[in-house]
Each structure stands twice: as structure tokens, then as C-alpha cells.
């Protein structure tokens, strides 16, 4: 049956043509912006709602609650609209206008916390609302249905699309659902694959990626599934994001730039490697933030 949810996943995997190092390594990127709501989070959103339905925990007409920095909220709003749920989303007020508008366009109710409260504050308020009986908290940070989506779809797709040639997998870490699920799948395959996570450097702010305080570390994260964690500076992420657009024709967001910056670093240090990175969303969600402003290109920054 051809319904919207059946268009989620099976995204393209493409090889970078101009940005990779000249040492025999290959850098491939999985274009998750091709999902219907525009990001890798479509996979987790569908999984969290469908699996909860299977367990009888929710049914159409219910109120669902989630804290989000943007992409998960947009994806959940889409699935909620498709299946007939009322979606309440909590988000820091410094996230881009495009993200807010997309959530509201799908009919979601958006509740903003301050920039200072951040994602930690959004998560705390979402939990309080659920405890008051205001709806069912999906809790992407602690919900095993989040990484399950990537264990059953993203991981197998990457293995098939590389014909098992992958040597390194690189992913930005926010909820850690993508890296946890993909790593779990790759660990079960016939050859070792190095798993590399990306987090912002101290003092850097990259939308969608977090350097979590210990007390807020997502419960779904399993450190044994990650071989190395690289720190990425905000400027490196933004410059790589712009390079992807100008030199590869790939229009993506800042966290994707961070992931590819990390992948290029890994490829440069490992001649002959086959490195796969997740390009988790599209660049149109960041236009109002100025990261694609004319000054970056007229001065040559990021090109």
C-alpha cells in the first residue's frame, strides 16, 4: 500500500566527488533530507508512534508530547497529522524560524522554553506535562524505539548500499538514536566497522548536536557501541556545510556539516577507508539563521 509512511527510508547514498582526501579513501554520505519531512528523524518518529500503537499504549486521538530541537518535532508533527494524533512539542526559542513554521504547518502545538533553559529545560517541562496527565511522552532520548528504527532500516541500508565495503561510520550525536541503532546492526555483520561519533567542542553550539551533561545523557546511548568521539568546532561544521553546497551540490544543515567534517578527518587519517556519514537534513531549515548569508560567499568563507 502506498501511503506517506512507506516513503520513509531507503534514502540515497552518494560518494563525495571533490571534497575527499587524495589518499585512496572514499567518503559517502546518506541523504536523509530525502525523507518526506526532510530529515533522518522521520525514521525514529515513525518507529516511536507505530511501536507504541502495537503495544496498545496510544491510539489516534491521543495527545502526544515531545521535547525537540527541531527535526524530531517536524517528523512527529507529520506522523501525528497522518495518523490523527494531537502533537505538543517543546523547543528552545533560539531554534530557527523555519523549524517552528514547519511544526505549526503540520498542526502541532508548539511550546517554547528560553534559550537559557535549552534542551534540558524542554525535556524537564515535557516530563512534567506528562506526569500531570497532559499527554503521552514519547521521550526520544530514552525510548528504545528510536535506535530500533536505525537498527532495522538505516544500518541495513548502509550495509547493502556499500556492498559491505564500509570501514567507518560517522554520525553526529544528539539523541544518539542514529549512531546507537546503526552501530548495533553493523556490530552484527561479518567484518569490523569503526563507529565514530561527533559532538560540539566546548563552547560551540551546533543545532541538533549536543555535548550532554552527565545527568542528561540519553538513556538509549550505549558507549560500548562507539569506538571514538570527535569534537567539532561550530565554524568547521558551518564551513563544511557551505562547501558541501558549493562544491558537491549537497544543500544540508549545520549538524550534517559537522558529520561530514568528521568523516573527512577520518578519511584523511585512514588511507583506503570507505567512510559513511549521515547528512541528516536539508539546508533550507537554516536560511534564516544567516549561515548561508552572502558575506560567507563574497569573502570566500567556506568555499
PLM region spans:
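PLP-dependent amino-acid enzyme catalytic core
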Residues: 1-303
Amino acid at each position: 500500500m502506498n501511503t506517506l509512511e512507506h516513503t520513509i527510508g531507503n534514502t540515497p547514498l552518494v560518494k563525495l566527488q571533490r571534497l575527499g582526501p587524495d589518499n585512496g579513501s572514499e567518503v559517502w554520505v546518506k541523504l536523509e533530507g530525502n525523507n518526506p519531512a526532510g530529515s533522518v528523524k522521520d525514521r525514529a518518529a515513525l518507529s516511536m508512534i507505530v511501536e507504541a500503537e502495537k503495544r496498545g499504549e496510544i491510539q489516534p486521538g491521543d495527545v502526544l508530547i515531545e521535547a525537540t530541537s527541531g527535526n524530531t518535532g517536524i517528523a512527529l508533527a507529520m506522523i501525528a497529522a497522518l495518523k490523527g494524533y494531537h502533537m505538543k512539542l517543546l523547543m528552545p526559542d533560539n531554534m530557527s524560524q523555519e523549524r517552528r513554521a514547519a511544526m505549526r504547518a503540520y498542526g502541532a502545538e508548539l511550546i517554547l522554553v528560553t534559550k537559557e533553559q535549552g534542551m534540558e529545560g524542554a525535556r524537564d517541562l515535557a516530563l512534567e506535562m506528562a506526569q500531570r496527565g497532559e499527554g503521552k511522552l514519547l521521550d526520544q532520548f530514552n525510548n528504545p524505539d528510536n535506535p530500533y528504527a536505525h537498527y532495522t532500516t538505516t544500518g541495513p541500508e548502509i550495509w547493502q548500499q556499500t556492498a559491505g565495503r564500509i570501514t567507518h561510520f560517522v554520525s553526529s550525536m544528539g539523541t544518539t538514536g542514529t549512531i546507537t541503532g546503526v552501530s548495533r546492526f553493523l556490530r552484527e555483520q561479518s567484518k569490523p566497522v569503526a563507529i565514530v561519533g561527533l559532538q560540539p567542542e566546548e563552547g560551540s553550539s551546533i543545532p541538533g548536536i549536543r555535548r550532554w551533561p552527565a545527568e542528561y545523557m540519553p538513556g538509549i546511548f550505549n558507549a560500548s557501541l562507539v569506538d571514538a568521539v570527535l569534537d567539532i568546532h561550530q565554524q568547521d561544521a558551518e564551513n563544511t556545510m557551505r562547501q558541501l553546497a558549493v562544491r558537491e551540490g549537497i544543500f544540508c544543515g549545520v549538524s550534517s556539516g559537522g558529520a561530514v567534517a568528521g568523516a573527512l578527518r577520518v578519511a584523511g587519517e585512514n588511507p583506503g577507508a570507505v567512510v559513511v556519514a549521515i547528512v541528516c537534513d536539508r539546508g533550507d531549515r537554516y536560511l534564516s539563521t544567516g549561515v548561508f548569508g552572502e558575506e560567507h560567499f563574497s569573502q570566500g568563507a567556506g568555499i
